[in-house]
Each structure stands twice: as C-alpha cells, then as structure tokens.
UniProtKB/Swiss-Prot annotation:
Name of protein: Elongation factor G
Domain tr-type G: 8-285
Pfam family, one: EFG_III
A single cellular component GO annotation: cytoplasm
InterPro entries: EFG_II, EFG_III, EFG_III/V, EFG_IV, EFG_V, EFG_V-like, EFTu-like_2, G_TR_CS
Function: Catalyzes the GTP-dependent ribosomal translocation step during translation elongation. During this step, the ribosome changes from the pre-translocational (PRE) to the post-translocational (POST) state as the newly formed A-site-bound peptidyl-tRNA and P-site-bound deacylated tRNA move to the P and E sites, respectively. Catalyzes the coordinated movement of the two tRNA molecules, the mRNA and conformational changes in the ribosome.
Subcellular location as annotated: Cytoplasm
Organism, as annotated: Synechococcus elongatus (strain ATCC 33912 / PCC 7942 / FACHB-805) (Anacystis nidulans R2)
Protein biosynthesis recorded as keyword: yes
Keyword annotations of the record: Cytoplasm, Elongation factor, GTP-binding, Nucleotide-binding, Protein biosynthesis
Family of this protein: Belongs to the TRAFAC class translation factor GTPase superfamily. Classic translation factor GTPase family. EF-G/EF-2 subfamily.
Amino acid sequence: MARSVPLEKVRNIGIAAHIDAGKTTTTERILFYSGVVHKIGEVHDGNAVTDWMEQERERGITITAAAISTSWKDYRVNIIDTPGHVDFTIEVERSMRVLDGVVAVFCSVGGVQPQSETVWRQADRYSVPRIVFVNKMDRTGADFFKVYGQIRDRVRANAVPIQIPIGAESDFQGIVDLVEMKAHIYTNDLGTDILVTDIPAELQETAAEWRSKMVEAVAETDEALLDKYFEDGDLSIEDIKAGLRKGVLIQGNDRLVPMLCGSAFKNKGVQLLLDAVVELLPSPQDIPPIQGTLPDGEVALRPSSDEAPFSALAFKIMADPYGRLTFVRVYSGILQKGSYVYNATKGKKERVSRLIILKADDRIEVDELRAGDLGAVLGLKDTFTGDTLCDDQNPIILESLFIPEPVISVAVEPKTKNDMEKLSKALQALSEEDPTFRVSVDSETNQTVIAGMGELHLEILVDRMLREYKVEANIGAPQVAYRETVRKAVKAEGKFVRQSGGKGQYGHVVIELEPAEPGTGFEFVSKIVGGTVPKEYVGPAEQGMKETCESGVLAGYPLIDIKATLVDGSYHDVDSSEMAFKIAGSMAIKEAVRKADPVLLEPVMKVEVEVPEDFLGSVMGNLISRRGQIEGQATTNGTATVSAKVPLAEMFGYATDLRSMTQGRGIFTMEFSQYEEVPRNVAETIIAKNKGNA
C-alpha cells in the first residue's frame, strides 16, 4: 500500500509551554482551522478536544500528552499537546523524545516562566528544532518584545521575530509578516476573515528595523546567502524562507528560533502559525537518522525510510476501553497489523493485533504505520515506555527516555479489605502508564507506598483509581524521598568466611569508596589485576554492594552519588561462591559507608512565586522561614516574582498558606532542583524518627 502523504510532507510536532500559556487553546484552534473539529472547544468550558481525561476537563490543565493527527494544506501534521505543570514533566520528556519539531507557546504577559525553562532544556536534550508562538497578545500587559528579550537572556536562544504585533492588549488587531512585509488584519471574531494589506504607516519604521535584524540572522546561516546579502543589502522572500528553514535545523546554540505572535483565544495568528509549522519545522527526513545499539554493541543509524528495517520506540502506555494502547513512533520501515515484532529491550516477540491513529477521542483503525508515523498498537503485553520494537532479523536498541526519579511518596491502602486486589491491579496499570509513578511495599511496615513527582501528581493518580478502577483509598501523610551519601574517601574490606563442616563459604573483597558527581547514583569500577578476585565473582560482589546501597546506614534511605572501586581481595578454590562474594561486597560497602562520614540529603525545589507587590514582604519572609534561599526577585506592572530554593520537606501545604497570605491572588510553581545536605539539627530529628526514637 502506497503512502497517503509523502514523508517530506509529514510534520511531527509538540505544543509545549508553561502552565496557562495557552497551549491547549492553541491546539484547539489548530484543529478548528485545519478542519478536525467544527466547533471551537475551550479549556475553561471543559470541552477541549485534547483534554480528554475527566480530571483535565475539571482542572483546566493538560495531564497526558494527547496525540492527534490533522492536515494543513497538503501536509499531515501529527500534534502532541503536552502538560505545562511540573508534576507531569515525564509527559513532556517522552513527547520530546519522539518529536521532530516543537511549537513553544509563551504568554505575552508572563513571558519565560520556570516551567518554560524546564521544557526548553528538555527540547535541548533531544536537540529538537523549534518555533515560538507568543500568545495572549490581547491580554493587559502584553509585551511581545519583552518576551523576545527574556527568551534570548533566560534560555539563551537565538530568537528571531518573523512577525510583530499590530497593537497590543485590547487594541491587538493583527500581525505584520516580516518575510512578506504585509499586514494581516483580522476583521471578524472567528479569525476566518483576514485582510492582507500594507503595513500601517505608524509601524513601517519598526517593521523595517525588525525585518533588517531577521534578514541579517538568516544571512548568517549560509555563506551563499551572506554573499548575496553583502552584495544587495537584502534577500528575496524565497531566500529568507529557505534560510529560516535551514537555520531552524542547525544543531547547537546557533540554531534560529523564529518568533510568531497572536491570540489563540481571540482567533488571531493561528493560520500563520500553521504555515510556519509546515514551512519551517522539519520532516522526519530532515532530522539526523535515529541512533541505536546492535546486539554486538556497535552503534548503528536507521534512516527515516520505509525501505529500511523496521524500528520504533514505545513512548507511552495507556489503559483504554479499546484495550492496552502502546503509543509508538516509527523511525524506520513499516509496521503492519497482524504482524509479529521483536521487543529488543526485553528480548521477546509480540503480536500486533490492531493499529490505530488518534484524533483525540476518535480512534481510527489503520492497516500499517510507516517511517515517521505516530500511532498506537493494541495487543502488546510486555512492552513498556522506552522499549524498542524492531524486526527480529535486524535487531537494534534505540536510545531510551530520560526518566526523572520521584521526589515524594505516600502510604496507600484501600478503604475496605475487599478492595485489596482491585487496588493492586489499579496501581499496576497506572505504574505501567507512567514510569515516574513507582509502587513498592515497605518491608518493615508492609504498607504499600506510592511515589511520584509532586502532590498534584499523586492526587490525580489517586483520583483516577476511584474514577477508572472504582477503588477508594486512604492516603497517608506525604513522605520526602531523602537520600544518603558520603563526604570522604576511605578504604574498607569485607570478609565472609564460614567453615562448619561440609562445604564452607569464602569471599573477601577490598574496596575504595569515595563521593561521586551529583546525579551519578551508585558507580562501580573494578581494578582487579592478577586474578586476586576471579572475574565470575566481581559481578556478585558488585550486586551485593548495589543491594546494600538501597538502604543507608543513617536512616535507611538509598545511598546515591558514591563510587566504589574494587581494588583487592582473595578467594578459596573450593569454598568460594557467588553468594559468598555477594555477602562480602555487602559487608565491605557497609563498613566503608560508616567510616566515610555519611550524611543525609534532601530534595531541594526551585520555587517561583508570583504575587501582587503588596504581599512581597510576607511571602519572602514565609519562604525564608521554610529554610528557603531567595535567589532573585523582580517586579513588573505591580506583580512581584520571587525565585527561591526551598527543601521539599518545608513545602507541604504551601498552596493553602500562599492563598491565605495573598487573599487567593498568589500563584507558584515548583520543580525539583537538586539534592543537598540536610542541616545537622534537622538531620538528627529525621534519623531519630526513622529509628523509632522520636
């Protein structure tokens, strides 16, 4: 079966931004103007197409990355609408991994917010080309050029306006297209009647100035264009469009980031945004081939072509009335309904029963997915987020996703004993869908513990248990994910010897333990020479150390950011075994940690609070009382913004306190920043409590 749309006319894009910048509304307008929906949905009415979960419609925030297919002109545009709330960072992360381009939406009033910076960093991690849409130009305090300055300063992007607004706030009438040097004036409320005319006289000088900056930036992307620019002092419209597209695809800090503007809510600027998506953002063919690892450890590339061997990445699992949906991005080859695929990550074959593409709530069955397509597979039982699917004759493992560690946990139990089985089924299904949601059983208390990225994250998952799985649950008080580490380098040994008739046990290792770089977890290196510890016992010794690191010596929290080097040891020809060396490894690491000045670490959050200026003093005082460090403050149009680093342990219940301090007018965002050492007096209390002495 031939392709319905040529690969060069496919665009896989994400719409990403800070909470409340207007992403979902922008997506809704794109669907309206491209003909997928015939009535505009509003987030605040609770009927947006992409917000299809009940909680999303109630809360007016987007939680899961809904994938929708639409068309513009003769292009197919696959859109993923991502959440802006920091508790749902994994949704943004997984969409960035499978996209070719991003529309970053910024509020013209709020500008670059902490979550915008997080999203930008995620796009940087996967080197995703992007364009910027400065939304809400009709709002009081709208300032396109202020946002331009913030994007250049705060996320260090090479931003290039290709439009400027005509008016602002209630006087926002339209847009100047700097490429064509024409004004687009919107003459009706639906944004369908557009008058393309000359630029108003009062804006001509400003437009000429910004066009000149744009042309200069475009010329610098290509030597031939630069020569033309020096000769003629200008570039043709065709040259500008070609140069912009080339500039967007540059890898690294010189990449151009074209800036557009509009008001999705007032239906202004969305068609021009769609034009920019198809003209400037890449097709699957324009991005570098996906890289993976072959079974022999060699690195291989898979070109985005139907003829190449099949490879795809599973980027999301979702429970659905249809069945278990596995969302995939096909990078190469063709995936057919009814075929068998090889899960290279798990080493298992699975059968594809059906293939579907989504238009929000609508499921459309298809016979195949081709290179560059996004779709969902039914029938896969053992495939999870981050797994590679491929042709078993040409196995490959693609680079997986970066999955952040949870920072908060709570104990959970069903309200009635009869619901125990339903609870465990619900927890299993939810943890399959969301890799940042972890479920474990506390070995001492036998309680089920759930962990996630924040209070809202866990609250929504508990809510889903009730709505989707009909399980009522009691939730304990939130617990902070403390960690332990060491502060100095030491040498220690572990010797396990047991001789009591019959076969004995003998394992002996000597290790050096030292602090490692933050974020490295547990690192192990073997420097054994001369066979003092045979190769087959090095792995078990490492395993023993790793398992022991799951429970530290101070308060039983996992040990992180440590490096253990195996330097010496001894063995017995008859009595040595894997188990003996595993125990010796465990003994060595325990001994080393005790000697290496162990300390307690706590998650510290990056907090940004926005409040009316009058409340600034009390809000700052409150943050300081929570062991917060103020990192900066700014005031714009009577609104003060405070940035601080605050331990997560001090942030529980902050939303309620902020509301009462500011008469409900304060808002805040919070995201994980880093682990830091807990002050001694606080650490003593935590350690005593954990040992049952509090």
